[in-house]
Amino acid sequence: MFSRVAKTSFSAVRAAKSQFSHSLSQQTSKTWVPAATCSKRSYAAEAKTSAAPVSGQIVAVIGAVVDVQFEDDLPPILNALEVQGRTSRLVLEVAQHLGENTVRTIAMDGTEGLIRGQKCVDTGSPISIPVGPETLGRIINVIGEPIDERGPIGTDRRSAIHAEAPEFVEMSVNQEILVTGIKVVDLLAPYAKGGKIGLFGGAGVGKTVLIMELINNVAKAHGGYSVFAGVGERTREGNDLYHEMIEGGVISLKDDTSKVALVYGQMNEPPGARARVALTGLTVAEYFRDQEGQDVLLFIDNIFRFTQAGSEVSALLGRIPSAVGYQPTLATDMGTMQERITTTKKGSITSVQAIYVPADDLTDPAPATTFAHLDATTVLSRGIAELGIYPAVDPLDSSSRIMDPNVVGERHYSIARGVQKILQDNKTLQDIIAILGMDELSEDDKLTVSRARKIQRFLSQPFQVAEVFTGSPGKLVSMAETIDGFESIIKGECDHLPEIAFYMVGNIQDVKDKADRLAEELS
């Protein structure tokens, strides 16, 4: 009897299970959508938002991390919340949903004075900042507030700092050189439009002046704008840069002819601000590219601080660290930002990123992840700076992915390699010269050394932004003039001209004019 009851019960359960699975499959067949028809954008749009602002209250404050509890709808990840009842504006960015209607957020400013029970309001969107020509000549922080004490930024245009990279169909596949007007860069390590350049340089080798000249030349040669994002840099350095830009004419306080927008998240800011300020700068640059069709220069100083801040945020959120203590999402964080820096059919963003290498270890995960995205490297050498040759770019260490005859042309490529060969041969001969002297060299070697010294001096160039310091007018040299000048040196057409004539001049005609002036003074 027991077995009969068991069989009857089992049959009933099986019948019920069959009926349930049938109804579930019918329901699923109505609502299921093939994965191929769902884009990333439609996924992002699915977050449930309400028309009225959703408010919650703070339930925990742990350093830069703030937990906020809501009664009804939760704000989506990356939404901005604003803390009420504070004199200074405090924005929180949603990072995690914890359960029990609580979200974990990262503060974009100091959390001193926050208490449990304080009210927070969901803004309904990610952090939004002012964009457009009105930002030129101004300094803003990570949440778009002006911090230069010159009043509010007069624009209604705003953009969210989180955006997707351009679609494949929107990207431009043409490899174009961005002519900077700086001889050593254009000849030996040219920048690609929409490329990413790593700028390696210690203190006092002319990094700031090179950055200012690039901003100035791109504005004059291409009519383009620049954006400078100071990520975790010293407040003093940011202040110095601002005043140097005013002195150099890159920023004008009198009219609207400024060529650069500044976005600062200094070293004393909380990690949330430092981790997001690069995205704020990138958003300002994206507006000029996408809405005005500009070729924009984006400077990030220092890209290592972006990674470092991401590591701090990751630890505060309780994620298990990866190699050397970095965040497990290191490659994703870097890739998400770097993929937005590209050339589209409308315009381009070319990024110059200063890179700090911890303990000079290039295998450290932070610089190693950055290198994967770089198209060119510009190395500033202290040894060259000590010789008084500015810009102090190392012509042998600097490199570019587009230094290829198919991109730059056969003539440019062969002249650049010829210049590097002469400089490398001269470097090899320096040991012999140090021990035995110039007299012991063969005639060919003497000629190589003579031409190398002329090339070294011809690689120097007076900058327009440094006119107020040097007293000599700056020079912007076209690509054609640069190639012609170095070709005439390596072919021996300038062997009769004195070395001093090649120092701090523009094109090869300036060399000849300077040589004539020197000859007249001596006669």
Swiss-Prot record:
GO terms for biological process: proton motive force-driven mitochondrial ATP synthesis. Residues 1-19 form a transit peptide. CDD domains: ATP-synt_F1_beta_C, ATP-synt_F1_beta_N, F1-ATPase_beta_CD. PROSITE patterns: ATPASE_ALPHA_BETA (PS00152). Coiled coil: none annotated. It comes from Hemicentrotus pulcherrimus (Sea urchin). Its EC number is 7.1.2.2. Belongs to the ATPase alpha/beta chains family. Transmembrane segments: none annotated. This is ATP synthase subunit beta, mitochondrial. It is found in: Mitochondrion; Mitochondrion inner membrane. One of its GO terms (cellular component) is proton-transporting ATP synthase complex.
